[in-house]
Regions:
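C-terminal motif of bacterial Sec signal peptides marking the signal peptidase cleavage site
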Residues: 21-24
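Carbohydrate-active catalytic/glycan-binding domains of CAZyme proteins
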Residues: 26-27, 32-34, 63-400
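Ser/Thr/Gly/Pro-rich low-complexity, disordered linker/stalk segments of secreted
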Residues: 36-76
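Bacterial N-terminal signal peptides that target proteins for export
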Residues: 2-14
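Residue-level detector of alpha-helical transmembrane segments in integral membrane proteins
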Residues: 2, 56-58, 87
Length: 400
């Protein structure tokens, strides 16, 4: 019998995850996220079927804890250095934008807010802000899945600047749109503000997109192409209902509030070992004529959660997975790093932002929280690499 070997990068990723978990668990007991986490009852995939940023009913019946021990740096950073995490609090699914040298980060619901927000002058020191989206659209509301939550469930925000105003895309339940398992679909809304801190207002009467027959639509991000065309990128929430997960792209109207034409399947599916049954959190950038689609895969409440990417020569695709995936994976003390965004600093350097658990406290059911990390993203000769996860001191953004 011929035995197939696992490709080198994926074998290394698997060994890192297993070794880290064995060390974290003392070599005994169940491994969180690798057979030790119960799947959502409504999911046929076996992975967490809850939306990114919100614990599944199976893994946690309560909102995220107010505090727990987060990842800690190995040493104290010196002058011109920093250490992860840069936001040492529960700040899941972080999306960061640069507005004239000031950085704004948006994150999934927490602390009684619909969404969280923070601002920084250097990507390292962050100041927490008020809820940027204090009111949701009329079509949004609580669902049975989130009936115990003290506030409406909103997550995975992504902001963009359009001329003199700001647009915020976010995911929330749409009560009138039933998905195949009979529950309300998770759909994408869009809100507008005059300032990046908000308040963002959503006056729409329906989601900007909601593929209810495909499980719903979540994890949207904005992309501005070099020719001025604007696009919305998202995933269908197929893992809710045993449906294949795909990424989609569709052109936006000039004001960013409507979609034009029809969505295009970007050609990436949850079909590789490291992704297990879930891909999510698409982030699209362009460099030197190549389009890079970053995304996360696997169960977000596990050490197997990681970041990969795919490339294409056309913005609509088809995109092809990089052979070296995943490029950001569990590495002590960062557990299950993912749901990334990419931001360019004032020197033109790229940074990937993502959340990560402390490897010894992965999952809300284990007292964990998802802190925000940043690491350098290097793109050379069509290949993307990340210098991380890095917990120890490293040169700070814009540092000489």
């Amino acid at each position: 019998m011929t035995r197939r070997s696992i490709p080198g990068p994926r074998r290394a990723w698997a060994l890192v995850v297993v070794a880290t978990l064995v060390a974290a668990c003392g070599g005994a007991g169940s491994t969180p996220g690798l057979g030790g986490t119960s799947p959502d009852p409504g999911s046929a995939s076996g992975a967490s079927a809850s939306p990114s940023g919100v614990p599944s009913a199976a893994s946690s019946g309560t909102p995220p804890p107010a505090a727990s021990e987060g990842p800690t740096a190995a040493a104290t950073p010196g002058e011109g250095e920093f250490a992860n995490p840069v936001i040492d609090a529960d700040f899941p699914d972080p999306h960061v934008i640069n507005v004239d040298g000031t950085y704004y980060a948006y994150a999934t619901t927490g602390g009684g807010k619909n969404l969280q927000a923070s601002m920084s002058e250097d990507l390292v020191e962050w100041e927490m802000l008020v809820d940027p989206l204090p009111e949701l659209a009329s079509w949004s509301g609580l669902t049975p899945l989130f009936s115990d939550a003290p506030h409406k469930a909103t997550w995975a925000p992504a902001a963009a600047q359009m001329d003199d105003r700001f647009i915020l895309y976010y995911t929330t339940p749409a009560l009138e749109m039933e998905r195949p398992d009979g529950r309300p679909s998770q759909c994408i809304g869009v809100a507008v503000a005059d300032d990046p801190t908000g308040p963002f207002v959503d006056e729409s009467e329906a989601p900007i997109v909601c593929q209810a027959d495909l499980g719903g639509s979540i994890d949207s991000t904005y992309f501005l192409d070099e020719d001025g065309s604007q696009y919305l990128v998202w995933k269908n929430d197929g893992n809710c209902c045993g449906i294949e997960t795909r990424f989609y792209i569709q052109e936006l109207s000039p004001n960013g509030l409507e979609l034009l034409g029809e969505p295009t399947d970007m050609g990436v599916a949850n079909d590789t070992m490291w992704e297990r049954n879930v891909i999510e959190a698409p982030t699209l950038i362009a460099r030197d004529g190549t389009y890079y689609l970053f995304f996360s895969g696997n169960d977000f409440a596990s050490a197997a959660y990681a970041v990969g990417y795919a490339t294409a020569e056309d913005v609509l695709g088809p995109y092809e997975d990089a052979e070296e995936n995943p490029i950001v994976a569990t590495e002590r003390p960062a557990g299950g790093p993912g749901h990334q965004s990419v931001v360019e600093d004032e020197d033109g350097d790229l940074w990937i932002t993502y959340h990560a658990w402390d490897v010894s406290h992965i999952g809300y059911q284990n007292g964990g929280r998802r802190a925000m990390w940043i690491d350098r993203l290097i793109i050379e000769d069509g290949t993307a690499t990340v210098e991380g996860p890095t917990a120890g001191p490293q040169p700070a953004p814009e540092a000489p």
